[in-house]
């Protein structure tokens, strides 16, 4: 696989290999057969980052080969959305003749949406002044005139300049309802929008007919908690990153959802609060004891759940666990399977043509 050529003809074989690998990893836990969700074979990534190479008067996107560390020129990138592919040549064509915009530009980040918006972040090894802003505004205006709905951001050491705003609003069709999600530049968002929709719909199906409330740890911009809110009386969700919490609060209002409460704290802190070990000012006005959380949802980082959080999670009758690293999931399941059975297993091909796997399990406590 090169950045410009995807081995599309190998997609089915690669997905079959991942499915087999997941089966093997989940076999010790008596997991059911995985339901497999395919990715689009191209234009599936909603974001991309490129280094910028300067050669004489020319300017082009590059990536580095992970094995050889050689640089590879990238003029088109079929893994990324069609919107990013349309924008890449137009953006460089506009920057190339402009000495102010190109000077010490070393990286460009793209974040696009299915709703047709895109954020472009230009990263520099120099201070950005008023002259840069003037040229950047002209660049934004010329690309807008070409039909691109874009936000332009300049970054340098300890500097972030937004010409307008640093977010885009995504709209995802989820089980018959359009969900609005504000996505903030440089914050985590699911990279594969088509797979994200399938993950949300799978989670909705897995929790259909639920009783009581839902607790979610690591909620990000509310991706799962807002979609799942329709299946529960109330949802209590935690997140540590300030921009994500702000986006989640906006998303609650934009989707007119009234049964979701977001708390800004780490999962480890929340564990202490639930156990009564510590009191937090941030929890004033929130009566944790009033929540009847019978289901807990976790979508942890690659490192998985720490031991204390595993113990917290184990107390709940139903656990919905989305994992971007089945190895740490397996490690967590060694403890969780002492008390819970896996009722559902899913493989989401979030990262085609790589060895990475995303999967989901629904666990229920043994009676």
Swiss-Prot record:
Cellular-component GO terms for this entry: cytosol
BP GO annotations: tRNA methylation
EC number in record: 2.1.1.-, 2.1.1.35
InterPro entries reported for this sequence: MeTrfase_TrmA_AS (IPR030390), MeTrfase_TrmA_CS (IPR030391), SAM-dependent_MTases_sf (IPR029063), TrmA_MeTrfase (IPR011869), U5_MeTrfase_fam (IPR010280)
Catalytic activity: uridine(54) in tRNA + S-adenosyl-L-methionine = 5-methyluridine(54) in tRNA + S-adenosyl-L-homocysteine + H(+); uridine(341) in tmRNA + S-adenosyl-L-methionine = 5-methyluridine(341) in tmRNA + S-adenosyl-L-homocysteine + H(+)
Catalytic residues of the enzyme: 324 (nucleophile), 358 (proton acceptor)
Record-level Gene Ontology MF annotations: rRNA binding; tRNA (uracil(54)-C5)-methyltransferase activity, S-adenosyl methionine-dependent; tRNA binding
Xref: PROSITE patterns: SAM_MT_RNA_M5U, TRMA_1, TRMA_2
Residues the record lists as binding S-adenosyl-L-methionine: 190, 218, 223, 239, 299
CDD domains reported in the protein's UniProt record: AdoMet_MTases
Keywords: Methyltransferase, S-adenosyl-L-methionine, Transferase, tRNA processing
Record's function text: Dual-specificity methyltransferase that catalyzes the formation of 5-methyluridine at position 54 (m5U54) in all tRNAs, and that of position 341 (m5U341) in tmRNA (transfer-mRNA).
NCBIfam families: trmA_only
Family: Belongs to the class I-like SAM-binding methyltransferase superfamily. RNA M5U methyltransferase family. TrmA subfamily.
Record's protein name: tRNA/tmRNA (uracil-C(5))-methyltransferase
Organism field: Pectobacterium carotovorum subsp. carotovorum (strain PC1)
Species classification: Bacteria, Pseudomonadati, Pseudomonadota, Gammaproteobacteria, Enterobacterales
Gene: trmA
């Amino acid at each position: 696989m090169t950045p410009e050529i995807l081995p599309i003809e190998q997609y089915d074989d690669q997905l079959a290999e991942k499915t087999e690998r997941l089966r093997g990893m989940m076999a010790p836990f008596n997991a059911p057969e995985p339901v497999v969700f395919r990715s689009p074979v191209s234009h599936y990534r909603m974001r991309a980052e490129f280094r910028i190479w300067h050669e004489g008067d020319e300017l082009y996107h590059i990536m580095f080969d992970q094995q050889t560390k050689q640089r590879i020129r990238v003029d088109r990138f079929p893994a990324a959305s069609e919107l990013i592919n349309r924008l890449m040549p137009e953006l460089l064509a506009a920057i190339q003749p402009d000495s102010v915009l190109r000077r010490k530009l070393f990286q460009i980040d793209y974040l696009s949406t299915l709703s047709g918006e895109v954020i472009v972040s230009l990263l520099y090894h120099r201070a950005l002044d008023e002259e840069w802003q003037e040229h950047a505004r002209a660049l934004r205006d010329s690309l807008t005139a070409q039909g691109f709905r874009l936000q332009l951001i300049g970054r340098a050491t300890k500097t972030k300049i937004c010409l307008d705003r640093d977010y885009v609003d995504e709209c995802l069709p989820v089980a018959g309802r359009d969900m609005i999600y504000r996505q903030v530049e440089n914050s985590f968002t699911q990279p594969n929008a088509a797979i994200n929709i399938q993950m949300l719909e799978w989670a909705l199906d897995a929790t259909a007919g639920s009783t009581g409330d839902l607790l979610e740890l690591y909620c990000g911009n509310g991706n799962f908690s807002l979609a799942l809110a329709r299946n529960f009386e109330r949802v209590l969700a935690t997140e540590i990153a300030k921009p994500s919490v702000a986006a989640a609060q906006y998303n609650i209002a934009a989707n007119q959802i009234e049964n979701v409460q977001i708390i800004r704290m780490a999962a480890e802190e929340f564990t202490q609060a639930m156990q009564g070990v510590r009191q937090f000012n941030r929890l004033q006005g929130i009566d944790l004891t009033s929540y009847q959380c019978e289901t807990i949802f976790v979508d942890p980082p690659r490192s998985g759940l720490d031991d204390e959080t595993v113990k917290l999670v184990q107390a709940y009758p139903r656990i919905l666990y989305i994992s971007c690293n089945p190895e740490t999931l397996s490690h967590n399941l060694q403890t969780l399977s002492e008390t819970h059975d896996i009722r559902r297993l899913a493989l989401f091909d979030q990262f085609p043509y790589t060895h990475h796997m995303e999967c989901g399990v629904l666990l229920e406590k043994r009676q």
